[in-house]
Amino acid sequence: MTLRLNRRDFVAGSALLAGTALALGPVRVEAATLAAPEIDRLTIRVLVDSGHELFLDKTDHPMVKVERSGIGIIGGSAALAGINSQWGLSLYIESTAAGVTRRQMLDFGLTPDVLVNNATLLGVDPATLDGLILSHGHGDHYGGLIGFIAKHRAALRPDIALVVGGEDNFCWQYVKKPDGKFTEFGVLDRADLKRLHVPWSTAEEPRLIGDQAISTGRIARESIEKVLPNTYVQYGMHDGAGCDAGHFTAAERQGEIVPNQHWHEHATCFNLRGRGLVVISSCGHAGIINSVKTAQKVTGINKVHAIIGGFHLYPAKADYVAEIVQGIKALDPDVVIPMHCSGVNFVAAAHEMMPDKLVTSTTGNRFTLGV
């Protein structure tokens, strides 16, 4: 089944709230690209991830309030409903500044049934959502989007908007089979967004999302990290969907299926008062160290409080993983919460090399920072 999202001219308005320059965070590294608003509190609920553990350690980290999820009960009745897990990621994020709370959904898992089920069980009210964010154009991050919007369009605010990383989000994606042939991995079809009256805008450059969240824009490739094997991409349009090939180089416009370098990927960040940067990397194809360093450069804030999300290290060999963990440790974050595609080798290496920073996560967990 092809996953599709919609064709829409660039909409800069509703999601591009260039906020007032507020007080900046702890330590500066250089002049900031944009002023990073301070927030007082950040809560992240994992709506979809690849596993659900009932018996993880419930002990809080000194810097994070950790809430583990059990079996859901709908409406207080005796009917039990399970939290579902699948390959993919979706996060429900609440940020609060000066008593004002903003609510964003970052990524949407692979299928709408799992996202809708889990969001309902975990108490997410679609009517309270201020915005939607897509980290990159992989089906396990946008697959639940259209179904979730269609299910809740009447409840969602009329001006709800989607922020994506770049034009590449809308390119056709492919997976190479063992026999060397390609099979479709889906496409974001902008026609669906148009049908559901959801405008979209890009974050190819650093920008604010609403008045509390920050997008890194395109992530600079400056560390030892490399894009590990994943999917393939085709630049151009066919069957009424795809990406505008005029946006790319002459070589990319040849229409060949090539390895995806994820130039469109961006990270979502927050400036937590008195603590520093919280960097959320949904998949980290561009490199988790690169993502953090780009966030530092964009905001001018050196202190990293938390690194959260998918780091795409599950295909990596142990020595490479250890090198990346050492690089993360050198950034001196207070907290590291790996999810999704980070991989068991990363968790094991982090537990060995920086156990005081590691917090584990599964579907349904909620983490509160700034408590």
Enumerate the predicted regions with their spans.
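Active-site-proximal loop/helix segment associated with metal-binding centers of metalloenzymes
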Residues: 208-268, 274
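Cap/insert and terminal regions of metallo-dependent hydrolase folds
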Residues: 131, 138-142, 161, 247-367
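Conserved beta-strand hairpin/beta-sheet module of binuclear metal-dependent hydrolase folds
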Residues: 51-53, 58, 65-122, 261, ...
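Active-site neighborhood of divalent metal-dependent phosphoester bond hydrolases
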Residues: 166-195
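Active-site metal-binding motif and surrounding structural segment of the metallo-beta-lactamase
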Residues: 113-164, 299-308
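N-terminal secretory signal peptides and thylakoid transit peptides that target proteins
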Residues: 1-18
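C-terminal segment of N-terminal export signals and the immediately downstream linker at the start
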Residues: 24-45
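Divalent metal-coordination and catalytic microenvironments
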Residues: 93, 119, 136, 212, ...
